[in-house]
Swiss-Prot record:
GO terms for biological process: response to cadmium ion; response to heat. One of its GO terms (molecular function) is zinc ion binding. The gene is mtl-2. Induction: By cadmium. It comes from the Eukaryota. Keywords: Cadmium, Metal-binding, Metal-thiolate cluster. This is Metallothionein-2. Transmembrane segments: none annotated. This protein binds cations of several transition elements. The lineage of its organism: Eukaryota, Metazoa, Ecdysozoa, Nematoda, Chromadorea. It comes from Caenorhabditis elegans. All cysteine residues are arranged in C-X-C groups. These are thought to be the metal-binding sites in other metallothioneins.
Length: 63
């Protein structure tokens, strides 16, 4: 299982204590999303439309 980053705590939800979590914007789309596809920056979580930022590598359109 891939370790998912918890950006709020900057820890992995499946942290085994042997590896740091990558909490960069690109790895933390659950925390950074944009209301529209035209947005060029990452926004705070809770907005509609899911992650559409150029610097966010999202596996899902929304969560």
């Amino acid at each position: 299982m891939v370790c998912k980053c918890d950006c709020k705590n900057q820890n992995c939800s499946c942290n085994t204590g042997t590896k740091d979590c990558d909490c960069s914007d690109a790895k933390c789309c659950e925390q950074y999303c944009c209301p529209t596809a035209s947005e060029k920056k990452c926004c705070k979580s809770g907005c509609a439309g899911g992650c559409k930022c150029a610097n966010c590598e999202c596996a899902q359109a929304a969560h």
